């Protein structure tokens, strides 16, 4: 997953000013950092000829769970967080971290396909809302697509 993420990320974002290409080590560090909170049902990749061409990566929104931790995140609260996420399913909202499609597949329905795949699965999931992270104003296609789903 980390390598597929890196390949799409580098093709989709590294061409923008101020964005550096991601190396393998950095991609693996990011995924390892996210691993404890990842719900695999919230990660979607699109492929063409076995090559990754897009992704939508979401995580459970931790804010409602960690609010009672009062800013402390020692071992006890880490255990409480894992229990809340993995056993009690206390996180009822999803946070969309990143969505991307490689430039050569823009305008070919990949974005809509990924959203549609998620839309079909969401009723089966224990979440009731989705918050999307920032969408750059340089990406009018994504802005229009998100506006049509809201």
Regions flagged by a language model, labelled:
Residues 99-106, 131-142:
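Conserved beta-strand-loop-alpha-helix junction that forms the acyl-donor binding cleft
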Residues 1-100:
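A conserved beta-strand-loop-helix scaffold within acyl/acetyltransferase catalytic domains
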């Amino acid at each position: 997953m980390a390598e597929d993420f890196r390949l799409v990320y580098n093709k989709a974002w590294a061409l923008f000013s101020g964005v550096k290409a991601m190396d393998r080590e950095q991609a693996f560090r990011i995924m390892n950092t996210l691993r404890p909170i990842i719900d695999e049902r919230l990660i979607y990749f699109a492929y063409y000829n076995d090559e990754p061409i897009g992704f939508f990566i979401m995580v459970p929104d931790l804010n409602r769970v960690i609010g009672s931790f009062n800013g402390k995140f020692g071992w006890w609260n880490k255990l409480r967080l894992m229990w809340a996420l993995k056993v009690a399913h206390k996180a009822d909202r999803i946070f969309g971290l990143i969505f991307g499609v490689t430039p050569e597949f823009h305008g070919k329905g990949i974005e809509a396909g990924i959203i549609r795949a998620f839309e079909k699965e969401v009723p089966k999931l224990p979440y009731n809302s989705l918050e999307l992270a920032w969408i750059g104003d340089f990406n009018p296609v994504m802005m229009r697509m998100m506006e049509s789903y809201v």
